[in-house]
């Protein structure tokens, strides 16, 4: 199963594609989509969507996952992050790809073992879980962590269905 994870942001959106075969995970690709702060907001969102649509067309994921937005004291930043996240959700929906959504602490716990893990710990564990992955940057590492989290959750759900059936 091909899964794609996203770490949304208006300035930088990370993406990561993995293949899940039972409990085995392997790295397929990752990257970061960047937009220029000097550009008009609508143009930045359009460029983000165009890049996401191309990535989804290229890798044809069966499922997607996105990190939830954490609010902060800067309402403008939170709003822009929410807009970028909306574009990510729209791109997946237009491609008819189902999306799992995960709080950052759930992603950290799934990958590192503790919900309070630091960014560098997440990056280190992504490299362990996906040997050979050349990370395009911290946002791409986070996106891969989101994809790994979704793979674990899907595997758990399948196991539960087998037990119940």
From Swiss-Prot:
Mg(2+) 1 binds at residues 7, 139. It is an enzyme of class 3 (hydrolase). Keywords: Cytoplasm, DNA damage, DNA recombination, DNA repair, DNA-binding, Endonuclease, Hydrolase, Magnesium, Metal-binding, Nuclease. Binds 2 Mg(2+) ion per subunit. Mg(2+) 2 binds at residue 67. It is found in: Cytoplasm. The active site is at residues 7, 67, 139. It catalyses: Endonucleolytic cleavage at a junction such as a reciprocal single-stranded crossover between two homologous DNA duplexes (Holliday junction). It holds the Pfam family RuvC. The keyword S-adenosyl-L-methionine does not apply. GO terms for cellular component: cytoplasm; Holliday junction resolvase complex. Its main location: cytoplasm. Its cofactor is Mg(2+). One of its GO terms (molecular function) is DNA binding. Belongs to the RuvC family. Homodimer which binds Holliday junction (HJ) DNA. The HJ becomes 2-fold symmetrical on binding to RuvC with unstacked arms; it has a different conformation from HJ DNA in complex with RuvA. In the full resolvosome a probable DNA-RuvA(4)-RuvB(12)-RuvC(2) complex forms which resolves the HJ. The RuvA-RuvB-RuvC complex processes Holliday junction (HJ) DNA during genetic recombination and DNA repair. Endonuclease that resolves HJ intermediates. Cleaves cruciform DNA by making single-stranded nicks across the HJ at symmetrical positions within the homologous arms, yielding a 5'-phosphate and a 3'-hydroxyl group; requires a central core of homology in the junction. The consensus cleavage sequence is 5'-(A/T)TT(C/G)-3'. Cleavage occurs on the 3'-side of the TT dinucleotide at the point of strand exchange. This is Crossover junction endodeoxyribonuclease RuvC. It comes from Rhizorhabdus wittichii (strain DSM 6014 / CCUG 31198 / JCM 15750 / NBRC 105917 / EY 4224 / RW1) (Sphingomonas wittichii). The lineage of its organism: Bacteria, Pseudomonadati, Pseudomonadota, Alphaproteobacteria, Sphingomonadales.
